[in-house]
Amino acid sequence: MGELFKWPSFSPFVPFHVSAGQTVIRKFGGLLTCEFLPPPPGRSFMMRQTYRHSVEGPIPENLRKLIESDHRPDGPPMHFHQWQTEYFKVEEGICVVEVNGKQTMLTPDDEEISCKAGNIHRFFIHPDSRERMTVILSASDSGVDYQLDRVFFENWYGYWHDALLYQGGLDFIQTLCIHDAGDHYTPGPAWLPFRRFIGYWMCVVIGRWIGGLLGYKPFFREYTTDWDFAVTKMKANPWTRRLVNDSYANKKSWDEQVELSSRPKAQNADYELLVTDITEENRRKKANGATNGHAKLANGTATGVAVEVKENGEELRKRS
């Protein structure tokens, strides 16, 4: 199901790709495609999500290994939402929705179904679904800062992609940090009593508190379209507030930068030479010297003086 974990790096993650500003995002070479849609009233997001069984054509070796492994992305890992109800409506193929251990197969003929807050669930593409499975996902708007919304999905799918393809697995702390910021909590094992309680506080303590102290943050500029919203979310959390930089809001537009750059160049006295292109400056002086030399040569001929111009522009005069 793609939930391959590795030993935590104990250092902040740096994205490998940029996907901010895209209404449609594609991950894992098109194995997963998400199209963000306008959410209906009372819902925090809506998107059309498509999973494929495989990818055709020549593909990089790291993606090939992932597709052939048990960790091929075919749906999110088992999770629950503390505050939100999630909705599913299949458009194409067969989607399996598992809620509290009970699986239901959904097709385009089925009506939208819901999974209430607190239920442990997952969904994935059925093996018998032809080429792909497409489902419309949405969730209730709980009004809290950290919930399922576009900011969360852009960052989770961006990190999921980069971690599995380029880092060999998910950093446990980073994963819990992002999940906590999206009301997306990983339950404890099925045999564990109070698995939902433990799963929730594990995300909060490890992902939010310890992760925040170590410099982990849930959102990244490279993945996030509405960065102002993401910054507001992180500034509201005391554990991530210090990790947020907001000077970007005062960045000048390109036209403003051009206007500021049109001012006269400052002079630097004896430091000026090393802030110029010495090669080009030397060539310019040579060219000017040669031009001046030719002019004087013409003048010398007219006055009966033969003029020889050296390469450096200096003159030797001889009486004719």
Curated annotation (Swiss-Prot):
Gene designation per UniProt: atD
GO cellular component annotations, sorted alphabetically? membrane
Q: How is it used?
A: Terreic acid is a metabolite with antibiotic properties. Terreic acid also acts as a selective inhibitor of human Bruton's tyrosine kinase in mast cells and other immune cells.
Phenotype caused by lack of the gene: Abolishes the production of terreic acid.
The job of this chain, per UniProt, is described as: Epoxidase; part of the gene cluster that mediates the biosynthesis of terreic acid, a quinone epoxide inhibitor of Bruton's tyrosine kinase. The first step of the pathway is the synthesis of 6-methylsalicylic acid (6-MSA) by the 6-methylsalicylic acid synthase atX. In the biosynthesis of 6-MSA, atX utilizes one acetyl-CoA and three malonyl-CoAs as its substrates and catalyzes a series of programmed reactions including Claisen condensation, reduction, aldol cyclization, and the hydrolytic cleavage that yields 6-MSA.
Q: In its UniProt entry, what is this protein called?
A: Epoxidase atD
Q: Could you tell me the keywords of this UniProt record?
A: Glycoprotein
The metabolic or biological pathway listed in the UniProt record of this protein is: Secondary metabolite biosynthesis
Residues carrying sugar: 245, 299
